[in-house]
Amino acid sequence: NKIRTYSVIVHEYFHVYQRALSHDKILDRNSPKWLFEGGAKVLEEIYLKQYYKKYLLKNDLKQSDNWSIKRVSKEPKLYEKYNTSPQKKGFDNNYSGSAFIVLALVNELKKNNISEEKAFELVFREFWIQRGKQPQGWNWQPSFQNTFGMTVPEFYERLSKYKRKDLKKIL
């Protein structure tokens, strides 16, 4: 349908934007898949909500048979790479799980007195600029810490405390 086509364009164009900001550092697959795909999925959802009053991610996240919040929150490292991201019943939860992690990151930034708008700017823009300043093959974690003011292990520890009931807080 037309709406789905437009939302896919937003999603894929955002990947072009990420690549441009990071000077193609994404292509070395040394950037976290959850931030790459999750950021694009969240932006796609913002677009759908703003222009079409649709919020597909909310429904996706509520379907516990398609993805496991416990797995996402307890094993986020699995979502760093495409080949380790879990699949459930043939459903590739690159998008749901990754979007959940991104929304949890935004929520954690808000807890640090960062406005929602600024938190999304950090996720959608600043991280990728920081990533672009690093040499090819360089670990993404220093860029994460420089951008978000916490280490990846610190964020994963915070993420580990999220439960299904916390979905309302981040949606």
Language model: regions and residue ranges:
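Extracytoplasmic/secreted envelope proteins and their assembly/folding machinery
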Residues: 10-14, 37-44, 99-103, 141, ...
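Zinc-dependent metallopeptidase catalytic helix centered on the HExxH motif
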Residues: 1-69
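Low-complexity, Gly/Ser/Thr/Pro-rich intrinsically disordered linker/tail segments
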Residues: 154-171
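Active-site-proximal alpha-helical
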Residues: 67-157
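Sec/Tat-exported extracytoplasmic proteins
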Residues: 12-13, 17-21, 43-51, 106-113, ...
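Short, flexible loop/turn segments with low-complexity composition
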Residues: 56-62, 116-122, 170-171
